[in-house]
């Protein structure tokens, strides 16, 4: 059975930990599995390399920065390969390019286009453990590219799909996916299995175990995911399509988890000209700046004017200001509020149960938490609230949906 294992920066964070990873990999080999390993740079190394590159330019060339930051994964993959050989097993490290990962030419945020698995397959047939540098690939010209935040997870999922691996194991420093952040709610429970769609919502709403790009790709390629702790042998969380859940579930939980995202800002535009096409123009301008808009509320127009509120990622405020400059003359005022948080309730059971939203709203009202904005999907309800109530809201909702049981 072929397994792809990915180890993150914390798991690879020291010489001792790299030896620990080698032992974990060899445990799988002992069970009779073929193993392809994808590794991140050692903890803190990517940030160190980024800062190093910035010493030479206030506006660093993206191509050159990709060449610098990609070194971190090359070092960790070579180190793990040597550790595996020390313990008596044939191993070889490959860069993203050597592993056949072809990407677009968007330096620092490239997209994987295809993977030529020939070399990896040949090495596996020769009984090698193949250790691949995550987070990177090469474009059609052979230029080194990096995949952006969470790129090593993306590398692992893409490789698992291309190799038709039985399983893709993502090793981190937590035991799996929890009903909410255990640092906020100590009664949070580990989830044994969760659907791609639920995980995608939790990831996009701020859950840190997996990023949504990786979950999206896993769903697209039907890659079975497991998130595990590299420092113990807990079962972790299985992430699959609903139809592939293991065992019989008496009833799908209405709510699977509560996610908190504090990296949000609210943009409030008052007195905007109320005419056909104004919203299309505003959001079109934001799209040109690649600004990701989430929650949107527009009031009913009166006296030829309307109010428009929406949320963005906090780090994109300056780009948003630039994008909206041409519209300032067409509104009375604009305000940016960073003191907000988004709390999301996620669960596939919402599709077949009514009243989920009212339970949340009543519970928040009881704690005097005011809701500023609301957005919903088939399996998610998100509310925007004052950031000072963020953690209280998480605990309240976790309790009201009995996720601690």
UniProtKB/Swiss-Prot annotation:
It comes from Helicobacter pylori (strain ATCC 700392 / 26695) (Campylobacter pylori). GO terms for cellular component: cytosol. InterPro entries: AceGlu_kinase-like_sf (IPR036393), ACT-like_dom_sf (IPR045865), ACT_Aspartokinase (IPR054352), ACT_dom (IPR002912), AKii-LysC-BS (IPR041740), Asp/Glu/Uridylate_kinase (IPR001048), Asp_kin_monofn (IPR005260), Asp_kinase (IPR001341). Its EC number is 2.7.2.4. It catalyses: L-aspartate + ATP = 4-phospho-L-aspartate + ADP. Signal peptide: none annotated. Gene3D superfamilies: Acetylglutamate kinase-like, VC0802-like. CDD domains: AAK_AKii-LysC-BS, ACT_AK-LysC-DapG-like_2, ACT_AKii-LysC-BS-like_1. Keywords: Amino-acid biosynthesis, ATP-binding, Diaminopimelate biosynthesis, Kinase, Lysine biosynthesis, Nucleotide-binding, Repeat, Transferase. Belongs to the aspartokinase family. The keyword Transcription regulation does not apply. It is an enzyme of class 2 (transferase). This is Aspartokinase. The gene is lysC. GO terms for molecular function: aspartate kinase activity; ATP binding. GO terms for biological process: diaminopimelate biosynthetic process; homoserine biosynthetic process; lysine biosynthetic process via diaminopimelate; threonine biosynthetic process. The keyword Phosphoprotein does not apply.
